[in-house]
Amino acid sequence: MKTLLRLLLKTQYQRNRSGPAQTEKGMTLVELLVGAIMAFLIITPMLGFVVDMLNTDRREQVKSNTEQDLQAAVDFIAQDLSQAIYIYDQAGITAINPATQLPPAPTNTTGTPILVFWKRQLIKNAVPINSTVSAKTPSACPANGSECNDTYVLSLVAYYQIRDTAPNSIWCQPSGGNCPTRIARYEIREPVRNPYTIDPTKPYYDAADLSDSQEGSKAFNKDFDFNKPTVNVTMGANFPDPEVLVNYIHYSSTNVPIPTGTQCQTLLSVTPPPPPATFNANNLLITDSSNHSFYACVDTSKNIARVTLRGNSLRRIQTDADYEATKSAYFPTATVQVQGLGGLGK
């Protein structure tokens, strides 16, 4: 009896141990396939949404950076123009003969002078107060300014729109496609004048008496006269290197608003002179017709200029970044109008 009971219990125990193993089941291939499809349908739109958000955020970031750069650029230009003595209009720049009298564009680039003017440049601690002080020349002026006064010199300033022809340039990134343009500034400055000279043929200190910052530019023409502002503008050689003000200015005129001389006439409130004097509104507009992204309206008689810049924020992240009206927000513009307050003897 005990043996029979032990056998039954043993059999039941083995059956209980093996029972669950026989009833366990995994997922079928169809179930796995359905699950994978559902996961794909759910995850793919989510990933697309995330990628779109990241791209949108990136575009907004470069747009913001471009707007800030443009504003900083026009603020700098406005400060520069505020000391202008004479601003050249289109006819004036043409009469100068830029090919020989203005700086050439850097190697492997094309460049157009857009804004050209004369200004006063402050040189601090540069002229001995009188003949009794120990500092007899500008270069000997002590740093504390106790023996020398500040002075002003003339500077010819030219803003160019420059575009690289080499697609791998550091100014053309991402490389390839149409390179953005940039704005560069040239400055040609006269040496410090000697107020104590007794020789009218030598209005300046000798080069040996001047420090590097007082010496001026080798391209400055000492024969320049404001009575003939388009003659002897520079020496035509030994031009200084340009300083880049801002990059990622738009590069094409396709679909962009095109400025006109008539618009400049309206914006600057220019009244044509009475006959028999002639008037051509196109002389008020200075632009590079290949892009119209950096242009100036100039009224030389009033010493006033209105400058406009158009950036291309999309070119910071892609090579195919042509202007479209639906994407105009990514091509921000900045404008400033300034009347030069500088003057000879002021």
Write out the residue ranges for each language-model feature:
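Residue-level detector of short, conserved catalytic/binding motifs and their immediate flanks
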Residues: 27-30, 113-115, 155-157, 305
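N-terminal secretory signal peptides that target proteins for export/translocation
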Residues: 1-17
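Long, hydrophobic/aromatic-enriched structural stretches that serve as scaffold segments
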Residues: 43-48, 112-124
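Short helix/strand-bridging catalytic loops that position acidic/His residues to coordinate divalent metals
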Residues: 58-65, 95-103, 133-146
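Short, glycine/small-hydrophobic-rich surface segments
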Residues: 83-117
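Intrinsically disordered, low-complexity regions enriched in Pro/Ser/Thr/Gly and acidic residues
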Residues: 119-335, 340-346
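Aliphatic-rich helix starts adjacent to a transmembrane/signal segment
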Residues: 14-78, 82
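Charged, solvent-exposed alpha-helical segments that act as regulatory interaction surfaces
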Residues: 10, 55, 86-90
